[in-house]
Amino acid sequence: MQYSTLAGQTDNSLVSNNFGFLRLPLNFMPYESHADWVITGVPYDMAVSGRSGARFGPEAIRRASVNLAWEHRRFPWTFDVRERLNIIDCGDLVFSFGDSRDFVEKMEAHAGKLLSSGKRCLSLGGDHFITLPLLRAHARYFGKLALIHFDAHTDTYDNGSEYDHGTMFYTAPKEGLIDPSRSVQIGIRTEHSKKLPFTVLTAPQVNEDSVEETVRKIKETVGNMPVYLTFDIDCLDPSFAPGTGTPVCGGLSSDRALKILRGLTDLDIVGMDVVEVAPSYDQSDITALAGATIALEMLYLQGAKKD
């Protein structure tokens, strides 16, 4: 049977399922596939505190990824990731728009079903709140996780709200999903609490240190734990990523962020996401292109393990 939505569910979304990442054909039955990594769009932005519009992020990232699809051996890598990994795009998560509780249930269930069938998840947001249900699914499967978190904000705020894109990494340690003492936050340049023992590498620090020193600190922190990797696009300076809900000046360049990512090849990264691309604030699609490039680099990290 041919489906046009994930698992053939009724989907009334107006922003979903145009075409796949890197021009991949959409595969709406990912659980039965032979995929190594499954890309899922997550058009959810009901937890934002600033400008909305990240629900259009998956579509924008996929559209920008067309600019990357032609390069079989992506520079500076020496292989084509599509020859090393079986990657599929299963389209967008189906949930009741306007119902955050339903979203959380559907996100956890989808990721859990993929993991239990031997797949790994790369999720395209969507606002950063999507990471919390993803962490729940991954911790249930892999146990307590280390977190590598690129962002302008620590997202460790405690404002009492159940659904907020600034509270996930306050909630996740409380639920035992991540070990903050083995987790690192990169690119931070906003006020934040120091109550939780995260290793915080501020944007000025990362911009002044060598890439090698930053990578060393990340690896020293997470060690050999299973790692969840999350990249909020506002980690980048607004000159490189204006199309996001809460931009903050003084961030990382795209070049520096990519070089840091490339240094993480030997870590046990078990789940990944790219979040907070909001294309209505973008200029010439540079934020969407940054998001697509980061997502592709994440996949190359996984392909490099096949050496």
Swiss-Prot record:
EC annotation from Swiss-Prot or TrEMBL: 3.5.3.11
HAMAP family tied to this protein: SpeB
Cited SUPFAM superfamilies: Arginase/deacetylase
Annotated protein name in UniProt: Agmatinase
UniProt catalytic activity: agmatine + H2O = urea + putrescine
Family note: Belongs to the arginase family. Agmatinase subfamily.
Cofactor list: Mn(2+)
Keyword terms of this UniProt record: Hydrolase, Manganese, Metal-binding, Polyamine biosynthesis, Putrescine biosynthesis, Spermidine biosynthesis
Cited InterPro entries: Agmatinase, Agmatinase-rel, Ureohydrolase, Ureohydrolase_dom_sf, Ureohydrolase_Mn_BS
Species the sequence originates in: Neisseria meningitidis serogroup C / serotype 2a (strain ATCC 700532 / DSM 15464 / FAM18)
Family annotation (Pfam families): Arginase
